[in-house]
């Protein structure tokens, strides 16, 4: 049975990193894999920039037109239809970073509904250190909005709480506490807890309730960035509609 993962979440939650990890893991298991970049909101993290890596692993990558050209008006390619029409084992969608971004995947509602029962997982990637995800109420609100715009029911959450190079043991623990409460209030289960192996191992050793951990997922980092340089470039660009918004860590 074809397995389709739709990864959605707020800015800086780590969707793209997880999408790559999901795809690489599937390919290493010998599965025919397609990876689709539908993030029409955040042009900073583009799967296209890892095109050589995906090609080496025989993963088909579908990206927005002009994704690496510096042109900010992106359009969804017609090749997205291949996710449903072709005989893949694993398909991963990396979807835009807010309710508006989730709209890009909403146009394929009928295609998703025609998938075999159990084939689709819609996963909300949550990083409680990022904007709009620092409280239970914020996580719930964004989750509800994304479901409406994506026209898909979220089937699980991923605790991917981190602060990039400043991550400590506190991140996954704090994410666990908030996401556990969201799960209790909404009924949406925690499907995965993800992070670098050293942090994940120490978190798991603390003995938290496995119901709110889901499947532990140790991830590798592929999307390296010079955060300070990028933040300055956003602030200096008058055409940027959200200067500094994506990457502030003091808003949680």
Predicted regions and their residues:
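Hydrophobic positions on the alpha1 helix immediately C-terminal to the Walker A/P-loop
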Residues: 18, 22
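The conserved Walker
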Residues: 11
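Hydrophobic anchor at the beta1->P-loop junction of P-loop NTPases
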Residues: 7
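Loop/turn-to-beta-strand initiation segments
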Residues: 87-91, 120-121
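Switch II (G3) loop of P-loop NTPases
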Residues: 64-69, 89-105
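N-terminal phosphate/diphosphate-binding loop that engages ATP/GTP or pyrophosphate donors
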Residues: 25-79
């Amino acid at each position: 049975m074809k397995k389709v993962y739709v990864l959605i979440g707020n800015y800086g939650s780590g969707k793209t990193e997880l999408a790559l990890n999901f795809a690489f893991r599937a390919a290493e298991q010998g599965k025919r894999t397609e990876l689709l970049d539908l993030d029409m909101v955040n042009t900073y993290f583009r799967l296209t920039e890892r095109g050589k890596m995906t090609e080496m692993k025989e993963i088909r990558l579908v990206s927005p037109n002009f994704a690496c050209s510096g042109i900010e008006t992106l359009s969804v390619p017609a090749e997205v239809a291949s996710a449903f029409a072709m005989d893949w084992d694993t398909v991963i969608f990396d979807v835009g970073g807010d309710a508006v971004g989730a709209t890009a995947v909403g146009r394929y509602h009928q295609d998703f509904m025609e998938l075999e029962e159990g084939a689709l997982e819609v996963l909300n990637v949550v990083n409680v250190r990022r904007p709009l995800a620092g409280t239970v109420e914020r996580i719930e609100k964004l989750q509800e909005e994304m479901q409406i715009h994506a026209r898909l029911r979220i089937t699980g959450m991923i605790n991917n709480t981190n602060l990039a190079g400043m991550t400590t043991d506190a991140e996954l623990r704090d994410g666990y506490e908030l996401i556990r409460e969201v799960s209790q209030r909404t009924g949406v289960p925690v499907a995965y807890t993800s992070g670098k192996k050293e942090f994940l191992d120490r978190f798991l050793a603390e003995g938290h309730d496995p119901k709110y951990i889901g499947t532990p997922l140790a991830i590798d980092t592929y999307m390296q960035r010079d955060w300070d340089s990028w933040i300055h470039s956003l602030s200096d660009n008058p055409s940027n509609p959200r200067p500094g918004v994506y990457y502030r860590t003091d808003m949680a």
